[in-house]
Amino acid sequence: VAPEEHPVLLTEAPLNPK
């Protein structure tokens, strides 16, 4: 699963704030 799919979990790098 790409980090772009779940940017919410990767709050350390909010590249895609959906």
From Swiss-Prot:
Keyword ATP-binding attached: yes
What residues form the membrane-spanning segments? none
Q: What is its EC number?
A: 3.6.4.-
Superkingdom is Eukaryota
Report the principal subcellular site: cytoplasm
Q: What keywords are assigned to this protein?
A: ATP-binding, Cytoplasm, Cytoskeleton, Hydrolase, Nucleotide-binding
Q: Which reaction does it catalyse?
A: ATP + H2O = ADP + phosphate + H(+)
Q: Which GO terms describe its cellular component?
A: cytoplasm; cytoskeleton
**Entry's localization field:** Cytoplasm, Cytoskeleton
UniProt xrefs under Gene3D superfamilies? 3.30.420.40
GO molecular function per UniProt: ATP binding; hydrolase activity
The first-level EC class reads hydrolase
Coiled-coil ranges per UniProt: none
Provide the family line. Belongs to the actin family.
Q: Tell me what this protein is called.
A: Actin homolog
Name the lineage: Eukaryota, Metazoa, Chordata, Craniata, Vertebrata
